[in-house]
């Protein structure tokens, strides 16, 4: 019988350390909800999980970018809707003035409203803003040095889309003319022929505005579809990442209970192993 080295006690002590470490890991996983808390838990799994997390966060931000872009489009379209109403009213006045029953004084009164409405078109264009950026003054036109509005709609590099918005000032729409008799540069309805020409000018302006609004509607529909696709992609990727990284709490609870029982059993056996050398004393008596 050996008394200098109690091999049974040493084995029980080593096994107790293993069981204690296993219990600590079980507690860590149960409290965090993650199967992988550090690279040592699963090195390859951690690498894949972190790559997926990067994509998920990128997709979520891209979704937010798209929603902000849709708000940008809706704001622009709202301003253009106001401009459309004004141009429609201008066209009514031009058709009214093109009727020969009105005197020069009557036309002058109509011209006052026309000039005010043209100024309002310019005011809308100059004050239409989103986050401090002018929308209708050509900042986002194809000819602009600043370039179009660019939305980043994906989780990776170069996944962006461009929004073009033409200039919608009164001048760009053709509402200024040198033919005015009242000293202004507004479109003039001072004569029947002048009013008739103005109708054509307004028709061209309406065509330009309607085309821009249609383009904005197409942009919005496209981005809404893109948002749904990104949301689905993020959801599926999150599910895949969860299967890699998240802990199966039921399984972890089973393991925790097993390791606790093993730990208690090991401590009991360690106590028994420590009593074995005492048998030598009985032999010496």
UniProtKB/Swiss-Prot annotation:
InterPro entries: Flagellin, Flagellin_C, Flagellin_C_sub2, Flagellin_N. GO terms for cellular component: periplasmic flagellum. This is Flagellin FlaB3. The keyword Phosphoprotein does not apply. Component of the core of the flagella. Signal peptide: none annotated. The keyword rRNA-binding does not apply. Gene3D superfamilies: f41 fragment of flagellin, N-terminal domain, Flagellar export chaperone, C-terminal domain. It comes from the Bacteria. Belongs to the bacterial flagellin family. GO terms for molecular function: structural molecule activity. Its main location: periplasm. Keywords: Bacterial flagellum, Periplasm. It comes from Treponema pallidum (strain Nichols). SUPFAM superfamilies: Phase 1 flagellin. It is found in: Periplasmic flagellum; Periplasm. The flagellum consists of an outer layer composed of repeating units of FlaA around a core that contains several antigenically related polypeptides. Interacts with FliW; a synthetic peptide of FlaB1 (residues 229-247) partially blocks binding of this protein to FliW. The gene is flaB3.
């Amino acid at each position: 019988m050996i008394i200098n080295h109690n091999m049974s006690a040493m084995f029980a002590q080593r096994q107790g350390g293993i069981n204690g470490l296993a219990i600590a890991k079980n507690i860590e996983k149960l409290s965090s909800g993650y199967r992988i808390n550090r690279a040592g838990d699963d090195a390859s799994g951690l690498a894949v999980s972190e790559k997926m997390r990067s994509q998920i966060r990128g997709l979520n931000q891209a979704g937010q970018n798209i929603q902000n872009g849709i708000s940008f489009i809706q704001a622009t379209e709202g301003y253009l809707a106001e401009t459309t109403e004004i141009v429609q009213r201008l066209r009514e006045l031009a058709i009214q003035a093109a009727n020969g029953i009105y005197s020069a004084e009557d036309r002058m009164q109509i011209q006052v409203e026309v000039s005010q409405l043209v100024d309002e078109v310019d005011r809308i264009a100059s004050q239409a803003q989103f986050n401090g950026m002018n929308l209708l003054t050509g900042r986002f036109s194809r000819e602009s040095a600043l370039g179009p509005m660019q939305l980043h709609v994906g989780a990776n590099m170069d996944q962006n889309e461009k929004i073009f918005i033409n200039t919608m000032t009164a001048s760009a729409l053709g509402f200024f003319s040198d033919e005015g008799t009242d000293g202004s540069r507004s479109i003039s309805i001072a004569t029947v022929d002048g009013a008739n020409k103005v109708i054509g000018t307004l028709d061209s302006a309406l065509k330009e505005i309607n085309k821009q609004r249609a383009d904005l509607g197409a942009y919005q529909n496209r981005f809404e579809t893109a948002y749904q696709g990104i949301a689905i992609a993020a959801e599926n990727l999150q599910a895949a990442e969860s299967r890699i990284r998240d802990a199966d709490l039921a399984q972890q609870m089973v393991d925790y209970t097993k390791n606790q029982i093993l730990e208690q059993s090991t401590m009991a056996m360690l106590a028994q192993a420590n009593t074995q050398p005492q048998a030598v004393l009985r032999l010496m008596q």
